[in-house]
Amino acid sequence: MTQPTEPIEFAVSADQITERFSGGSTLPSAVLETLRAICATSVENESLANHGRDWWPLAMHWALQGKTPRKPGAVCAPSTTDQVAALVAVCNTHDLPLTVAGGRSGVCGSAVPLYGGIVLDVTSLQGIVSVDEVSGIVEVLPGTFGPDFENELQSKYSLTVGHFPQSFDISTVGGWVACRGAGQYSTRYGKIEDMVVGLEVVLANGDVVRTGGAPASAIGPDLTSLFVGSEGTLGVITKVWLRAHPVAQFQARASYVFPSFIDGVNACRDSVRNGATPAVLRLYDQTESQRSHGLDGTQCTLLVLDEGDERLVKATLDIVRESAIQNRGTVGDVELVEKWLHHRNDTSGLQALTRKGYIVDTMEVSAPWSKLESIFNGVRTAFMSAPGLSLIHI
């Protein structure tokens, strides 16, 4: 099974790694013994250092200086919901800070245990528990990595959830839910909150609750939505029920070139408003289109991919084509879609640039169609006021 991928090497051996934010992380021996009686618990230098970071760009630079942001006092790896509940109860009793971690693929430092305490590593909670093939609902454990999840779901059940974030190869189902992620196929399948049917969650006092489970409810607040996107602040997710779809039997692709970014935005908007929701509708700005697609630096590229029923896919691509042409688009190189599929999750460039001293960061914003042009221009101008390269896509 897949294990966490560390972002970059440390410049020193494990016993020489220091903390960027110090504060003391040693736990009392009695507490450690209690934790060890519950589940696998590590205080090894390498484990503490790795669980003190994620893919935060600044932390990658600190690693090359022999530093990790902040070490926990221990790393606990429960393999059952009961063990998670017992760990959380111990932290509650002893007033210990608790940070939940999975693949640690985030780029914002949110998996860093800033207050020490323990890191609860959910990656021992792996695998598909059950599949309701009639209803299209899959029960899966939170520490299951994207490739393991989709490979088993597709090969054994001919189903897919359709959630493919850029971090797919190195992130977990629990992380997708806790961080309310969006995948690269979200125009067709929705974001993760559209896929979650129910959750099992351990609360801060160790109690276990189950939310959702029914197709819909007309009574009371939606408790599931409270935990989706809560990033571990309200509880520890220990099981997830997700909607699944039959693996697509037909796929079609297209590419278009626009004289300006706003022309491409308008084409995307018109496509969606006319009922076309292709799995991938990905527009690149002039800089990224030149760098990745070989254009002249003034044009923008739109990549399109859809899958599913052949009739629906063809109709969808027809609507996108009409919208593109009506907004000054011309047909581009469809092979660019295949190139994107092959390289879309590659992180090797990030590590290589970091080793050369560059800061490589990412940010995302959401806005109504009416404000996209002003946001695009504002963000681009702000970034280009400093030396560097800015690449934008929607």
Task: Indicate residue ranges for each PLM-predicted region.
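FAD-binding subdomain of flavoenzyme oxidoreductases
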Residues: G127-R282
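N-terminal flexible segment immediately upstream of the FAD-binding catalytic core
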Residues: M1-A89, G106-G136, Q286-H293, L336-T362, ...
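Anion (oxyanion) recognition and catalysis
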Residues: R36, N92, Q154-S155, V272, ...
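Short, ordered loop/turn segments at secondary-structure junctions
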Residues: G102-S105, Q166, L283-Q286
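C-terminal substrate-recognition/cap domain of FAD-linked oxidoreductases
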Residues: N45-H61, P246, A252-I392
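Helix C-cap/helix->beta junction micro-motif
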Residues: H94, K156-Y157, N327, A386
